Amino acid sequence: MKLIPTGEMTLGPFFPREFAAGANHLGDEIEVMGKITQLDGRALDNVVVEIWQADRDGRFDNPKFSGWGRAATDAKGIYRFKTIKPGAPKGRIAHINFLILYSGLMRQLQTTMFFELAADPVLDAVPEKRRALLVARREGTVYRFDLRLRGERETPFFDD
């Protein structure tokens, strides 16, 4: 499947218009979930959460794997995705990228969820004492990745 070029002023990543049937069932299935909170710990509802990731072989350009999803948090601030565990792209460790959009934010927030603490150029750029905030907690086949938008334990966010 070929990706269509888009204008420079749009947000990426860019995805194909259609995905093959069963496109997300090409690896070990996992659930990624978490809670999004604000400075005082209150849950935020109706936050738009987008993810994008590599396939099980670490490729982002697999036409048989969509590699992305979008969800909104519920009244308790919870989001959920069913996906596969990604492989490690060249020069990186396995990860899932997140984009957060919320009414009142002046810009989108981007972060990355890792499955372990290990050498990675993005993770290594985060101060060591804050790196654990980017590692999901595993609970069976569920990976919990809570996001705090502000405060002492604020999730590290990256410039786009």
Regions found by a protein language model. Give the residues of each.
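Beta-strand-dominated extracellular/periplasmic modules and repeats
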Residues: 1-160
